[in-house]
């Protein structure tokens, strides 16, 4: 069997960011201005602060403005909705990101759904999810879309392949299952109540780890030649899949870190650029007709 190929999220991410930088420099030279991404952080979660700072720096690097709105831990749902409404009405703001998770007293779903569709560059609103499920143009959840772009950059055709997605969160597992379906894969969506998970994983041509548990998906469950996409990032720099043991039997695999993670922020920047240019992310299409 040929050696497995590492899906280099860092390299592909850099390629995407260079393209964004070139497009925005051209737009600025033509007098079209500069896009702005607004990020809201509620509370004092250290991990969230780190993620937000990474996004702010990434914006600056590609020539994008960022607006960082910091709200106190005790913020109510209504106060947060008020901040989002202000950003919805601000013509200088092209994208709005509400950093997840929010403190327990806030209705996160209500807050997500307050974001204007044309500024939902993180793909978190119910309407964006519905548009994705209908394979209409939309902004997509950034992590699953990043995985799809990785597959496409490496020329991996999922048509007719059996993809097993482990994890059903509304911003990761579920949208990934829909995206793969839209690209003509046959998808099994698994979760914590799934019976005999190892036998399902054994059938997978493509395995997606999106369960949030360190190395939960074992190497021994997988068949030779599988494509491994690990969206997890846990303590100890490990994902949701036993990649260190499974990579030798894979055809392609994402490392942790350096695989899916860099793609997430790049997709956020990409979709903010699309919003600035007045368009949605392109509809997911395969070379095989939908039927």
From Swiss-Prot:
The keyword Oxidoreductase applies. It catalyses: (6R)-5,10-methylene-5,6,7,8-tetrahydrofolate + NADP(+) = (6R)-5,10-methenyltetrahydrofolate + NADPH; (6R)-5,10-methenyltetrahydrofolate + H2O = (6R)-10-formyltetrahydrofolate + H(+). Keywords: Amino-acid biosynthesis, Histidine biosynthesis, Hydrolase, Methionine biosynthesis, Multifunctional enzyme, NADP, One-carbon metabolism, Oxidoreductase, Purine biosynthesis. Transmembrane segments: none annotated. CDD domains: NAD_bind_m-THF_DH_Cyclohyd. SUPFAM superfamilies: Aminoacid dehydrogenase-like, N-terminal domain, NAD(P)-binding Rossmann-fold domains. GO terms for cellular component: cytosol. Belongs to the tetrahydrofolate dehydrogenase/cyclohydrolase family. This is Bifunctional protein FolD. It comes from Leptospira biflexa serovar Patoc (strain Patoc 1 / ATCC 23582 / Paris).
């Amino acid at each position: 069997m040929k050696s497995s190929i590492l899906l280099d999220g860092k390299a592909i991410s850099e390629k995407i960011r260079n393209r964004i930088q070139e497009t925005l420099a051209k737009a600025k030279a033509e007098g079209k201005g500069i896009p702005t991404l607004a990020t809201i952080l509620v509370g004092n979660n250290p991990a969230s602060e780190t993620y937000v700072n990474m996004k702010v720096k990434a914006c600056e690097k590609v020539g994008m403005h960022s607006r960082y709105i910091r709200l106190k831990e005790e913020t109510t749902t209504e106060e947060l909705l008020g901040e989002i409404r202000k950003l919805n009405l601000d013509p200088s703001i092209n994208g709005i990101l509400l950093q997840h998770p929010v403190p327990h007293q806030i209705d996160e779903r209500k807050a997500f759904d307050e974001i204007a569709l044309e500024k939902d560059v993180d793909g978190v609103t119910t309407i964006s999810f519905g548009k994705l499920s209908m394979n209409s143009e939309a902004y997509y959840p950034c992590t699953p879309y990043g995985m799809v772009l990785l597959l496409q950059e490496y020329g991996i055709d999922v048509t007719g392949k059996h993809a097993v997605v482990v994890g059903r969160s509304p911003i990761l597992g579920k949208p990934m299952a829909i995206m793969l379906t839209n690209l003509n894969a046959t998808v099994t969506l698994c979760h914590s109540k799934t019976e005999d998970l190892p036998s399902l994983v054994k059938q997978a041509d493509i395995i997606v780890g999106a369960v949030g548990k360190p190395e939960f998906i074992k190497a021994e469950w997988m068949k030779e030649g599988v494509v491994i996409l690990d969206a997890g990032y846990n303590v100890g720099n490990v994902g949701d899949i036993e990649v260190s043991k499974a990579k030798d039997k894979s055809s392609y695999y994402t490392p942790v870190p350096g695989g899916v993670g860099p793609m997430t922020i790049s997709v956020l920047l990409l979709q903010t650029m699309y919003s600035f240019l007045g368009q949605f992310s392109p509809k997911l299409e395969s070379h095989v007709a939908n039927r």
